[in-house]
Amino acid sequence: MRKDAKENRQRIEEIAHKLFDEEGVENISMNRIAKELGIGMGTLYRHFKDKSDLCYYVIQRDLDIFITHFKQIKDDYHSNYEVMQVSLDYLLQFKIDNKALLQCIEAGNNKLRFYQSAFYQELFDFYYDLFKSDDDTYTKFKTDMLLQSLSTSVFAFQIEHRHISIEAYRNYLLNIYLDEVERND
């Protein structure tokens, strides 16, 4: 990418991040970002496919930091129960802190893109390793189902409409996804 194109892209990300922080992700359109920057929509869409794509890049630095700390959990805790409990606490807090950006990313036109993202793959690998069994198909299924239950929309629905506390949500997931032996370790 040319230097001026890189600078343009970085400027777009910075202004989008500022506007998202000030007015909320849901209140800012791609058109508003382009007007704020004094650029055409074509320039904006040359860098980002849609708002979901832009949100992914805006949060990318935070995702990288999150993944670094997330991976450390396996080194700091030894039982599957502890690893799962601490990782869920960390992930759920991250979802609370970044709810609007994550909802935008997950609600994008190309939902498959989120499931193919490095972030999703890191989460998948982390929990797949935790659930690993002789039945690879089952382990993949179990991991995908956990991650689906951790989607921002499912989490928000349970907290906001079912009025489940975050701690209860975490504990329910522990009960569903860890067998009794692992829970009592």
Curated annotation (Swiss-Prot):
Q: Which UniProt keywords apply?
A: DNA-binding, Transcription, Transcription regulation
User: SUPFAM superfamilies of this UniProt entry?
Assistant: Homeodomain-like (SSF46689)
Q: Where is the signal peptide?
A: none
Q: Which domain of life is it from?
A: Bacteria
Q: Which InterPro entries match?
A: DNA-bd_HTH_TetR-type_CS, Homeodomain-like_sf, HTH-type_Tx_Regulator, HTH_TetR
Q: Which molecular function GO terms apply here? A: DNA binding
What is this protein's record name?
A: HTH-type transcriptional regulator SAS2464
Q: Which organism is it from?
A: Staphylococcus aureus (strain MSSA476)
Q: What is the lineage of its organism?
A: Bacteria, Bacillati, Bacillota, Bacilli, Bacillales
